[in-house]
C-alpha cells in the first residue's frame, strides 16, 4: 500500500473574512492589532506557510484575490469554505485548500504542515483542535468535495460546518498551547469583541518579549 502524501505546492490558502462582526461593532478584518490590521496579520502568517492565498470577503482586501460567497443569507463559515474550495479547484496543480479565520491572528506557524502530514488519503479532511476543542474553520479540505458541499448546502437548512464534517472522513490534529512571557496562549484565541481585541494586544506584546 502506497503512503499518501501531499506537498505544499498542492495547497492553496484562503482567509475567511466574510462574517458580520456584530459583537465587534465594526469590520473585524480591518481592526488594528498593533500596527497592522487583523487581515494583514493573518495573511502574513498564512502566506509564510502556503501560496497562493486569497480572502473570502465581499469587498476588496489588501493585495490578494477576493472571492465572495456563492451562497447568501445565513450560510455562515460553510459558505466561505465552499467558496474557497471552488476557487482552489480552478488553480492548476492544487488538490487541497486550507482555510483560516481572520479573527485568529495567532494560529500555529506549522498549521498547514501538520494538517497535511495527518492526511492518510486524498479524500480525507484534516481539522485543527486545541484544549479539547475542535476548530473546524481551520481545516485542510480536498477541492473535490466542492460539488458535494454545494449539493448539501442547497438541501440542508442547518449549514453548519460540524454537520458537514459528520458526512466525511475527518482527522483531527491537536495543537499545543504556545508559551509566552505572560502565560500559555491558545493559538486559536479568537477576537469577537473590543475586549478580545484589547486582550490580543496584550498577547501580541507577550509574544514579542
From Swiss-Prot:
This protein's UniProt keywords: Cytoplasm, GTP-binding, Magnesium, Metal-binding, Molybdenum cofactor biosynthesis, Nucleotide-binding, Transferase
EC code(s) of this entry: 2.7.7.77
Localization annotation: Cytoplasm
Residues that hold GTP according to the record: 16-18, 28, 56, 69, 103
Domain of life: Bacteria
GO molecular function terms listed in the Swiss-Prot or TrEMBL record: GTP binding; metal ion binding; molybdenum cofactor guanylyltransferase activity
GO cellular component: a single term: cytoplasm
Domain remark text: The N-terminal domain determines nucleotide recognition and specific binding, while the C-terminal domain determines the specific binding to the target protein.
Family: Belongs to the MobA family.
Protein name (Swiss-Prot/TrEMBL): Molybdenum cofactor guanylyltransferase
Upper taxonomic lineage: Bacteria, Pseudomonadati, Pseudomonadota, Alphaproteobacteria, Hyphomicrobiales
Amino acid at each position: 500500500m502506497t503512503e499518501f502524501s501531499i506537498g505544499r505546492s498542492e495547497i492553496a490558502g484562503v482567509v475567511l473574512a466574510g462574517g458580520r462582526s456584530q459583537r465587534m461593532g465594526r469590520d473585524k478584518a480591518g481592526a488594528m492589532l498593533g500596527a497592522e490590521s487583523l487581515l494583514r496579520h493573518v495573511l502574513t502568517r498564512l502566506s509564510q506557510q502556503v501560496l497562493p492565498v486569497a480572502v473570502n470577503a465581499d469587498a476588496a482586501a489588501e493585495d490578494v484575490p477576493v472571492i465572495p460567497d456563492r451562497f447568501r443569507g445565513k450560510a455562515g463559515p460553510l459558505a466561505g469554505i465552499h467558496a474557497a474550495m471552488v476557487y482552489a479547484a480552478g488553480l492548476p496543480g492544487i488538490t487541497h485548500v486550507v482555510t483560516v479565520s481572520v479573527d485568529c491572528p495567532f494560529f500555529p506557524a506549522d498549521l498547514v504542515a501538520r494538517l497535511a502530514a495527518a492526511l492518510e488519503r486524498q479524500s480525507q479532511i484534516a481539522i485543527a483542535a486545541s484544549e479539547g476543542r475542535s476548530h473546524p474553520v481551520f481545516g485542510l479540505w480536498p477541492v473535490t468535495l466542492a460539488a458535494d458541499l454545494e449539493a448539501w448546502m442547497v438541501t440542508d437548512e442547518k449549514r453548519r460546518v460540524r454537520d458537514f464534517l459528520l458526512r466525511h472522513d475527518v482527522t483531527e490534529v491537536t495543537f499545543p498551547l504556545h508559551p509566552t512571557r505572560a502565560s500559555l496562549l491558545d493559538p486559536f484565541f479568537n477576537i469577537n469583541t473590543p475586549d478580545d481585541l484589547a486582550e490580543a494586544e496584550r498577547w501580541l506584546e507577550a509574544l514579542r518579549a
